[in-house]
């Protein structure tokens, strides 16, 4: 049976994709057949092949399997806004059955599947359904990405607590340095490590340019999962 993990973040723009690429690289190095999955993405660009989302493309590149774009990202929207808003505006409902079918298809091909969410934990997919609902439905172990900056401790603890209250496994967390480390960086890391009830899988240093394309798998200790 495939190993499956869901990557969420303490907020949008905290480095979920950077961490997801690092995790995929580490899993590939460990000998797994890996697949990244971004079931819903907004903020995509028009290309000759159709809409393409940069996060989904990064997952596609960092998967060890050769996957079609639509397999990695079945729901793609142009406007960078909450999926439930643009989905309703375009008359394209996001269906959990389609999301789950995509996951099943990847599980048939890969033995290590990483699913990346959109935004934070409770990102709405419709007026009545959130990403959290789908993850709970699928019973996916969760990896939390924390963008290390002022305010991250509270956001990390709130997210970790609600994940556990949903009855899900918080499998681990990844620290992502979204800015050059400040003078309190070490204290933030010490506090987060003490308070988050899951192992620290690794810390990805601040990378000024194209972090999704960097060799970041070396920062991840996959043995802790």
Swiss-Prot record:
The active site is at residue 38. Mg(2+) 1 binds at residue 13. Pathway: Cofactor biosynthesis; biotin biosynthesis; biotin from 7,8-diaminononanoate: step 1/2. ATP binds at residues 13-18, 55, 116-119, 176-177, 205-207, 212. Binds 1 Mg(2+) per subunit, in one structure a second Mg(2+) was seen. It catalyses: (7R,8S)-7,8-diammoniononanoate + CO2 + ATP = (4R,5S)-dethiobiotin + ADP + phosphate + 3 H(+). Mg(2+) 2 binds at residues 17, 55, 116. Keywords: ATP-binding, Biotin biosynthesis, Cytoplasm, Ligase, Magnesium, Metal-binding, Nucleotide-binding. It is found in: Cytoplasm. One of its GO terms (biological process) is biotin biosynthetic process. InterPro entries: DTB_synth_BioD (IPR004472), P-loop_NTPase (IPR027417). It comes from the Bacteria. The keyword Aminoacyl-tRNA synthetase does not apply. Substrate binds at residues 42, 188. The keyword Chloroplast does not apply. Its cofactor is Mg(2+). Its EC number is 6.3.3.3. GO terms for molecular function: ATP binding; dethiobiotin synthase activity; magnesium ion binding; protein homodimerization activity. GO terms for cellular component: cytosol. Changing residue 12 to V: Strong decrease in ATP affinity; essential role for this residue in the steady-state affinity for ATP. Belongs to the dethiobiotin synthetase family. Homodimer. Catalyzes a mechanistically unusual reaction, the ATP-dependent insertion of CO2 between the N7 and N8 nitrogen atoms of 7,8-diaminopelargonic acid (DAPA, also called 7,8-diammoniononanoate) to form a ureido ring. Only CTP can partially replace ATP while diaminobiotin is only 37% as effective as 7,8-diaminopelargonic acid. In another study both CTP and GTP (but not ITP, TTP or UTP) can partially replace ATP. This is ATP-dependent dethiobiotin synthetase BioD 1. It comes from Escherichia coli (strain K12).
